[in-house]
């Protein structure tokens, strides 16, 4: 395990350094501009941004990721968010293992988990060859049978998508009609009008109400008309 762990740390260090240097370049450029603005007058936003940039500059010059910095005030948090630094992004490591280790992982993936834990990052295990085999099966039933034989509830691809969504604080709502069913991504905590805006900006501006069907009810009754007839269609306002 030692050579494997050393190699992973080395690769990780190279990537971290490249991203940190890019962030440092961004921070120094923004500092040069905003320190001048802050010095000219009583520009509160510029002064807040300068404080944020200086905090980031300090940790980046120490070879640390920008995500290691935390800010207490909402103004600082917003300024930090608007910089879109690469090393503030959440990290998910995907450990590719053999089929026998697809469910529980193995010693190698556990070493990756230990290293990732040092920076508060997440790890998930996936067997790429097994995923290829699953993708080659034609029916949903065949895929589920294959997964059950391996002791898995769902494919690694599905788990990866869910993990990434959770890490990015994203969720999905579905629109369904006679011609099309489509999934839409939104940020967790958004209200119905904001979600409507994902479909079209005019829907958010002119939002009045949303007709909502629970996913389980749609599967149970089979159509919007049947759900409506069963009294399971909800009408929600702007605060939903």
Task: Pin down the residues of each PLM region.
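Amphipathic alpha-helix face/heptad-repeat signature
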Residues: 20-23, 49
């Amino acid at each position: 395990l030692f050579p494997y762990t050393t190699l992973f740390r080395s690769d990780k260090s190279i990537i971290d350094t490249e991203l940190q240097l890019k962030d440092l370049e961004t921070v120094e450029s923004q500092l040069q501009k905003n320190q001048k603005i802050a010095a000219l007058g009583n520009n509160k936003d510029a002064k807040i941004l300068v404080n944020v940039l200086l905090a980031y500059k300090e940790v980046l010059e120490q070879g640390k990721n920008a995500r290691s910095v935390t800010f207490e005030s909402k103004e600082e948090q917003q300024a930090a968010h608007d910089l879109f630094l690469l090393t503030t992004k959440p990290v998910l490591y995907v450990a590719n293992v053999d089929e026998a280790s697809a469910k529980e992982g193995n010693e190698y993936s556990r070493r990756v988990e230990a290293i990732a834990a040092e920076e508060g990052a997440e790890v998930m295990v996936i067997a790429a060859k097994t995923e290829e085999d699953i993708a080659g099966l034609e029916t949903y039933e065949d895929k589920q049978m294959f997964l059950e034989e391996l002791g898995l509830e769902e494919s690694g691809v599905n788990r990866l998508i869910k993990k990434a969504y959770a890490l990015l604080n994203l969720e999905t709502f579905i629109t369904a009609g006679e011609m099309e069913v489509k999934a839409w991504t939104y940020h967790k905590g958004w209200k119905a009008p904001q979600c409507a805006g994902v479909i079209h900006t005019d829907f958010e501006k002119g939002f009045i109400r949303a007709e909502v069907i629970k996913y389980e009810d749609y599967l149970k009754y089979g159509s919007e008309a049947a759900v409506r007839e069963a009294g399971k269609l909800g009408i929600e306002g702007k605060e939903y």
